[in-house]
């Protein structure tokens, strides 16, 4: 733990005061959470801070996703807090989600006094044990003198290498105990990234230069390398595909962009990948939703795999060249060795496959249809807008259709696929980016998972617009049951219809039901232009499907639908 030098006189802090002091020195300006008995000492100290604003969520899961929205847009750790017991367990889903999507979070929870741990005390659960499999690292701070090192290590770990959540569980007596410090800890910084060999760079460059049909495959791990990713793609004329987490790394309309691959990617993209003789995989983990049946994915392609996480190299597909390193550092060394090539024959084959398997966007100009609504919303904002989604059909329709053109524009739950992510993540994005419009695409099933956070958006007058596609159903469940289960649809449609307009109005949101508007596009433009939170409601037919689709367990070439 680095220190900022010896103070003129030792300073005395309670554990709670030190936590807040460290957060201030770390540059944290917003914390979100819900207080409870076991963390009240921290909240008492937080109330005295003139630097940190506290956002009171309506549910701890909401607090976790609010923190995610901040971390995803800013690229640095964000902080959420809760009490022990139910407060901590309510955070679990948001923290697990952050782990799978590599989002840097610091989760601080209160715990019963250290002497009472293991006695089934009031609101005691084994937070440390619960959080082991869903965090990058976790701590149970049993003594006050451990706290400075733990806080420093937690922030360093959360943002170093492959980012992820770190959980700090602090017993109440540690929060109230005192510590005297001669030196104050400096803000924690990232650890240096792994070094890599010049030989691996030369080998990768030789493979790229020799390839006839190379494809650049981007995952979420390229988030900090947009300039060099584009430089590599354009210099080597590499058709480029992106996972759900990487959308926006190349603008949607870029001539080299193939868009998203996998389960709901373009049919042409999945067939183009099968023709590749080389995959240059940057910051991606060969997720099953992206590659389908593993043994049938790009069977004739050699693989260059660059990832900061050694565990991902060779886990699913065996690479011919594996480089554990920061993607941007690798590209800085690799690009000078790359030959500029037109690759005209390869681009002609790509164009032929795109013509043979054109993207079908039905009713793309009708704002009362799913794709048309997405296009209409996009026409109301510029590229500064931040897009969040919940999880379901609306998520995939938005991924397919929205013109995502920059990194950190697109926030969605990829690995865990968490319904209820969208609204609180949008709140976090709006808090961290007060000058940006934030658009949250949601479905009726997902919105109900964290609908209480409408209150948080309203109380803070955040410029969050919820675009609700309401089909009175769990759309993706309905779709899979309709297509793949002999007994048809069961427990996927709701027997009643909720009046979301009244609910939103009750929370203080502006509202607009496009189905009742004479000019839906004009109404959409007007409500998005107005500042403050709003709900935009549109009815969607429950029989609508997300096409094309790779059936579960199938190869990417076995897509069904339009």
Can you name each region flagged by the protein language model?
Residues 4-5, 109-150, 246-349:
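Glycine-rich, acidic loop regions that bind phosphate or pyrophosphate groups
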Residues 2-10, 145, 181-183, 206, ...:
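Phosphate/pyrophosphate-binding active-site segments
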Residues 29-30, 72-82, 88-109, 132-184, ...:
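Structural signature of the thiamine diphosphate
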Residues 40-114, 116-123, 216, 263, 268-278, 283-287, 313-316, ...:
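Thiamine diphosphate
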Residues 72, 220-304, 405-436, 449-451, ...:
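Glycine-rich, anion-gripping cofactor-binding loops and their flanking helix/strand elements
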Residues 2, 172-199, 203, 346, ...:
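Aromatic-enriched
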Residues 16-19, 34-37, 42-46, 351-430, ...:
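Active-site diphosphate/adenylate-binding microenvironment
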């Amino acid at each position: 733990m680095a220190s900022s030098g010896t103070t003129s006189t030792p300073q005395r802090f309670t554990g709670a005061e030190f936590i807040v002091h460290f957060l201030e020195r770390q540059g944290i300006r917003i914390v979100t959470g819900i207080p409870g008995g076991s963390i009240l000492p921290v909240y008492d100290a937080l109330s005295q801070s003139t630097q940190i604003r506290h956002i009171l969520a309506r549910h701890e899961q909401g607090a976790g996703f609010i923190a995610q929205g901040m971390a995803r847009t800013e690229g640095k750790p964000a902080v959420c807090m809760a009490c022990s017991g139910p407060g901590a367990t309510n955070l679990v889903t948001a923290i697990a989600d952050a782990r799978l999507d590599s989002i840097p979070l610091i989760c601080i929870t209160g715990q019963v006094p250290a002497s009472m741990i293991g006695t089934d005390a009031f609101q005691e659960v084994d937070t440390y044990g619960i959080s082991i499999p869903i965090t990058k690292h976790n701590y149970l701070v049993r003594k006050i003198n451990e706290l400075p090192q733990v806080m420093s290590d937690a922030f360093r770990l959360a943002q170093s290498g492959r980012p992820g959540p770190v959980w700090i569980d602090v017993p109440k007596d540690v929060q109230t105990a005192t510590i005297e410090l001669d030196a104050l800890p400096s803000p924690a910084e990232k650890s240096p990234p792994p070094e890599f060999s010049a030989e691996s760079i030369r080998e990768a460059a030789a493979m790229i230069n020799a390839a006839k049909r190379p494809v650049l495959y981007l995952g979420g791990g390229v988030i900090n390398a947009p300039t060099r990713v584009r430089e590599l793609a354009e210099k080597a004329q590499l058709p480029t595909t992106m996972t759900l987490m990487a959308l926006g790394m190349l603008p949607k309309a870029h001539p080299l962009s193939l868009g998203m691959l996998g389960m709901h990617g373009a049919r042409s993209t999945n067939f183009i990948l099968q023709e590749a003789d080389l995959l240059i995989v940057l910051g991606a983990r060969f997720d099953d939703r992206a590659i389908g049946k593993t043994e049938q994915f790009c069977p004739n392609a050699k693989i260059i795999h660059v990832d900061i996480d050694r565990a991902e190299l060779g886990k699913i597909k065996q690479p011919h060249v594996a480089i554990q390193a920061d993607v941007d550092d690798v590209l800085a060394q690799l690009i000078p060795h790359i030959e500029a090539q037109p690759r005209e024959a390869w681009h002609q084959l790509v164009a032929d496959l795109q013509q043979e398997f054109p993207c079908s966007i039905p009713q793309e100009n009708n704002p009362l249809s799913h794709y048309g609504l997405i296009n209409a919303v996009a026409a109301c904002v510029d590229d500064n807008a931040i897009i969040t989604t919940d999880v379901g059909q609306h998520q995939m329709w938005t991924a397919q259709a929205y013109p995502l053109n920059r990194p950190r524009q697109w926030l969605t739950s990829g690995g865990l696929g968490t319904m209820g992510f969208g609204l609180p993540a949008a709140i976090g994005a709006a808090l961290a980016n007060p000058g940006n419009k934030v658009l949250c695409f949601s479905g009726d099933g997902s919105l109900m998972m964290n609908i209480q956070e409408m209150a948080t958006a309203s109380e803070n007058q955040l410029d969050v617009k919820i675009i609700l596609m309401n089909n009175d159903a769990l759309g993706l469940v309905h779709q899979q049951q309709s297509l793949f289960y002999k007994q048809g649809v069961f427990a996927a449609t709701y027997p009643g219809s909720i009046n979301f307009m009244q609910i939103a109005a009750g929370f203080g949101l502006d509202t607009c039901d496009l189905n009742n508007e004479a000019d839906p596009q004009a109404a959409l433009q007007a409500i998005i232009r107005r500042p403050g939170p709003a709900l935009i409601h549109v009815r969607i037919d429950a029989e609508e499907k997300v096409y094309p689709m790779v059936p579960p367990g199938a190869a990417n070439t076995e897509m069904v639908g339009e």
